[in-house]
Amino acid sequence: MDPIRSFCGKLRSLASTLDCETARLQRALDGEESDFEDYPMRILYDLHSEVQTLKDDVNILLDKARLENQEGIDFIKATKVLMEKNSMDIMKIREYFQKYGYSPRVKKNSVHEQEAINSDPELSNCENFQKTDVKDDLSDPPVASSCISEKSPRSPQLSDFGLERYIVSQVLPNPPQAVNNYKEEPVIVTPPTKQSLVKVLKTPKCALKMDDFECVTPKLEHFGISEYTMCLNEDYTMGLKNARNNKSEEAIDTESRLNDNVFATPSPIIQQLEKSDAEYTNSPLVPTFCTPGLKIPSTKNSIALVSTNYPLSKTNSSSNDLEVEDRTSLVLNSDTCFENLTDPSSPTISSYENLLRTPTPPEVTKIPEDILQLLSKYNSNLATPIAIKAVPPSKRFLKHGQNIRDVSNKEN
C-alpha cells in the first residue's frame, strides 16, 4: 500500500506543477505577465550607468592629459626663452673674451669639414716642407696649424681696465731676447691634425737676491740680573726711595766698616740701608684726643696740658681748634719711664663758664652807606644804628640763668 500511495502523491504534485506552468505560459502569451518587461529594462539601465561611469573616467583622464600637455608646452616655451637669453649672454661673453685675444672654440664637425676642403691643396705643400725641415721638427714641437687663430690667448692686464698706475715693474733677466727669438723662428706648416699643439714659452729663471732681505738678529742686552741682584730678602723699595740721597763711595765704605753686624744684602742696597734708623725711620706722632676745658698731664714731665682760651672764629667753631703744648713720642725710653714712675696728678677741670663758651657777636658799628641808601627809600624814618657793646660771657650766662629761673617761677 505504501508504494502505491507515494506514487499517487508524486503524480498529484506533478499535475499541480504542470497546471501552474501552463497557466503562467498562457498569461505570458496573452501579455498579462509584467516580469518579462521589467527585466530587460533593468538590464538596459545598468548598461547605461556603466557607460556613463566609463565616460566620466575617460573625461578625467583626458583632462589630466590635457593639463600635462599644457604644462609641457609652457615648459618648452620657458626653455626657449631661456635659451635665447643664454645665447645672448654667450654672445656677449664671447665678444668680451675676444677683446683679450681668446678665440672661440671650433666645433668638431666644422673642423672635419675644413680639413676635407683644405686637405687637397695643403698636402703638396706639406710634403715639401717635411723633406727640408725634418731636423727642425725633431728639435722643436710643431706650431699651431692654420685652422687655429694666429692670436695666442692673453691674460687680462690692469691697463685694460685703466689701472696702469698699479702695475708693478718686474725686471727679468733678458726678457726681450726671448721675445725676439720667438719672433724670428720660421713658421713651419704641418698637416692639420686633430690635436694641434701650440708652442709655449718657458718662463725665464730669476736668481733670488737675499741681500736686502737678510734677517738681522737682535742684539743681546744685559738687564743687570745676576746672582747678587736676585736676592729675595729685599724688594728694593727702600733703595729706590733713598736713591736721591746717595753719598760718595768713600763715605759709604767707612760706614760699612762700622756696621759689620748688618745682614748680607746686595751691594747697591747696602749703601742705602746702612744708615741709622733715627735718620730715616721717623715714626709718626701719637694722636691726641682733646676735650675743651680738660687738662691731660704728659707722660714725660707729668705736666698738665694747658688749655688755650683762644676765641673761636666767627664762621666755624669746633673743638678741634684747641692746641696742645706737649706731645708724647711714639718710642719711650726706659730710663725716663723709671724716673717718672710717680702717679700723675688728677686732671683739673676749668671753670664752668669756659665750658659753655659761645663766640662773641660781631660789633656792628655802622651800616654801609650803599645799604643805608637802599633802606632809606623804603623807610624814611630810619635812623643810623647805635654801636652794640660786647657783653662778657659771665654776664651773658647769668642773664640766661635768670631768664630760666623767671620762667620756672611763672610756671609754678
Curated annotation (Swiss-Prot):
UniProt record, GO biological process: attachment of mitotic spindle microtubules to kinetochore; cell division; chromosome segregation; establishment of meiotic spindle orientation; metaphase chromosome alignment; mitotic cell cycle; mitotic metaphase chromosome alignment; mitotic sister chromatid segregation
Keyword line: Cell cycle, Cell division, Centromere, Chromosome, Cytoplasm, Cytoskeleton, Kinetochore, Microtubule, Mitosis, Phosphoprotein
Cellular component terms (Gene Ontology): centrosome; cytosol; kinetochore; meiotic spindle; mitotic spindle; outer kinetochore; SKA complex; spindle microtubule
Residue list for modification Phosphoserine: S34, S119, S139, S152, S155, S159, S267, S318
Protein's UniProt keywords contain Cell cycle: yes
UniProt KW Cell division keyword: yes
Localization per record: Cytoplasm, Cytoskeleton, Spindle; Chromosome, Centromere, Kinetochore
An example Gene Ontology molecular-function term: microtubule binding
Listed Polar residues bias regions: 146-156
Modified residue annotations for Phosphothreonine: T265, T384
Chain spans, region Disordered: 132-156
InterPro entries per record: SKA3 (IPR033341)
Function: Component of the SKA1 complex, a microtubule-binding subcomplex of the outer kinetochore that is essential for proper chromosome segregation. The SKA1 complex is a direct component of the kinetochore-microtubule interface and directly associates with microtubules as oligomeric assemblies. The complex facilitates the processive movement of microspheres along a microtubule in a depolymerization-coupled manner. In the complex, it mediates the microtubule-stimulated oligomerization.
Family: Belongs to the SKA3 family.
Subunit structure: Component of the SKA1 complex, composed of SKA1, SKA2 and SKA3. The core SKA1 complex is composed of 2 SKA1-SKA2 heterodimers, each heterodimer interacting with a molecule of the SKA3 homodimer. The core SKA1 complex associates with microtubules and forms oligomeric assemblies. Interacts with SKA1; the interaction is direct.
Record's protein name: Spindle and kinetochore-associated protein 3
Protein species of origin: Homo sapiens
Name of the gene encoding the protein in the UniProt record: SKA3
